[in-house]
């Protein structure tokens, strides 16, 4: 499944909506998606949203859409 992960670049500051960023990744579960991001970045994860159906189609039309892959 594809997940959209909303995050802040650092855990040092409190989250601010204006500085929230996102990435897309493929994982088996939401827990696996969180683990991938936590193990490979210093990001402060705010929310993980599963994408499927019309929601995924909409996101894929965004020019910023690309799947993030981490080296294992």
Curated annotation (Swiss-Prot):
An example Gene Ontology biological process: DNA-templated transcription
Subunit comment: RNAP is composed of a core of 2 alpha, a beta and a beta' subunit. The core is associated with a delta subunit, and at least one of epsilon or omega. When a sigma factor is associated with the core the holoenzyme is formed, which can initiate transcription.
GO molecular function list: DNA binding; DNA-directed RNA polymerase activity
Family matches, as Pfam families: RpoY
Its biological purpose: A non-essential component of RNA polymerase (RNAP).
Taxonomic superkingdom: Bacteria
Protein family: Belongs to the RNA polymerase subunit epsilon family.
Keyword tags: DNA-directed RNA polymerase, Nucleotidyltransferase, Transcription, Transferase
Known catalytic reactions: RNA(n) + a ribonucleoside 5'-triphosphate = RNA(n+1) + diphosphate
Enzyme nomenclature, EC number: 2.7.7.6
HAMAP family, alphabetized: RNApol_bact_RpoY
Name listed for the protein in its UniProt record: DNA-directed RNA polymerase subunit epsilon
GO cellular component entries: DNA-directed RNA polymerase complex
């Amino acid at each position: 499944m594809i997940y959209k992960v909303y995050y802040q670049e650092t855990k040092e500051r409190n989250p601010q909506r204006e500085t929230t960023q996102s990435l897309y990744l493929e994982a088996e579960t939401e827990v696996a998606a969180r683990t991938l991001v936590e193990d490979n970045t210093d990001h402060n994860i705010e929310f993980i949203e599963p994408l499927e159906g019309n929601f995924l189609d909409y996101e894929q039309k965004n020019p910023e859409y690309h799947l993030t892959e981490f080296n294992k």
